[in-house]
Regions:
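Pre-Walker A adenine-sensing motif
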Residues: 1-8
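Residue-level preference for the first positions of well-ordered beta-strands
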Residues: 10-14, 167-169
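The catalytic "switch" region of P-loop NTPases
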Residues: 131-132, 137-280
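P-loop NTPase nucleotide-binding core
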Residues: 12-160, 273-277, 281-310
Length: 310
């Protein structure tokens, strides 16, 4: 966060954990910390069908829907609140310029003009939102639409920063689904998009992955696909080819920590719903079941390994 705040580009972070290891919870923790620290966040859960990494124009609507900054959620709320401050919006639009994306810059300017004239109803129904959310290009597979989506993302992160955010944290979960793409060419295109995400202005990328992704990307980085990739794709693969990736595992949770966490959650529910009775026994029973269930708990203790193998 400190590097991002200083307008430096941090190395991407890869959270490596299998199902049930707490990988997604760790991504949520990064998101919460980023928002508390004055950063914006955008996120997407990738899959090869509806949110594939080789088609950023399909990813963009998910990221627009999940953008967050301060108390605002969703691009209508985030961008809308920034545009309502005419002075701040004017400064941000002037600072960012069109970023080679005249359509999204024009859409934002249109919404700003409507907002400044008090046309609240027109702001809410304006077709300019389709450009900002990316839904106008989401169903097109043309290569130039891929480029347009990436440039729009770059514009959005630059605008949010110019309007007051310390930067934007891009969160991607389930990156291992890259192995579900049709072929090597599809993966090469995905690496190009990933390399462009890393290049977005004022951003830090955090990816949730499993061993499946590690096997695929390391094989591709050592194969001729590396030389066939675009400049952006090669930049992403070079990180793996040179062994410069930053990998961490989700924190392991021991029984004592699980009990403590469960007790905190119980207290939160009792504070929110005072009529809730004492659930201490149920909490302890749930934690005990969790710790014994090796199939759902890859963080199991070493002594439970025999049961898992059986």
């Amino acid at each position: 966060f400190s590097l991002l705040q200083k307008k430096k580009t941090p190395s991407p972070l890869f959270l490596n954990g299998e199902w049930g290891s707490g990988k997604t919870h760790s991504i949520r923790l990064v998101r919460a910390l980023a928002l508390e620290s004055g950063f914006a966040t955008m996120e997407a859960v990738l899959n090869a069908r509806t949110c594939p990494p080789n088609y950023p124009q399909r990813i963009m609507p998910y990221m627009a829907r999940n953008i967050a900054f301060g108390e605002e959620r969703g691009i209508r709320s985030v961008i809308g609140s920034l545009l309502r401050d005419d002075k701040k919006a004017g400064h941000a639009l002037a600072t960012v310029g069109d970023r080679s994306q005249a359509d999204i810059a024009q859409a934002a300017s249109t919404l700003r003009a409507l907002s400044s004239h008090g046309e609240t109803a027109l702001v809410g129904t304006s077709t300019a939102w389709r450009v900002l959310t990316g839904t106008d290009i989401a169903h097109s597979d043309y290569g130039y639409r891929r480029t347009k989506a990436l440039l729009r993302l770059h514009w959005t992160t630059a605008f949010v920063r110019a309007a007051g955010a310390k930067g934007t944290v891009l969160l991607f979960d389930e990156l291992e689904t890259i192995d579900q793409l049709w072929n090597r060419r599809s993966r090469a295109t995905a690496y190009e998009a990933l390399g462009s995400f890393l290049d977005a202005p004022g951003t830090w990328c955090v990816f949730g992955i499993t061993e499946r992704f590690l096997r695929v990307v390391r094989d591709d980085a050592r194969s001729d696909l590396y030389w066939q990739a675009s400049i952006d794709g090669r930049r992403f693969l070079k990180m793996w080819r040179d062994g410069n990736e930053e990998l961490i595992a989700p924190p392991k949770v021991a029984d004592e920590q699980a009990l403590e966490l469960a007790a905190v959650v119980e207290r939160m529910y009792r504070d929110a719903y005072p009529e809730t009775g004492d659930c201490g026994a149920e909490v302890r029973s749930a934690v005990s079941d969790w710790s014994r269930n090796a199939a759902r708990n890859p963080r199991r203790r070493p002594e439970s390994g025999g049961a898992a193998e059986g």
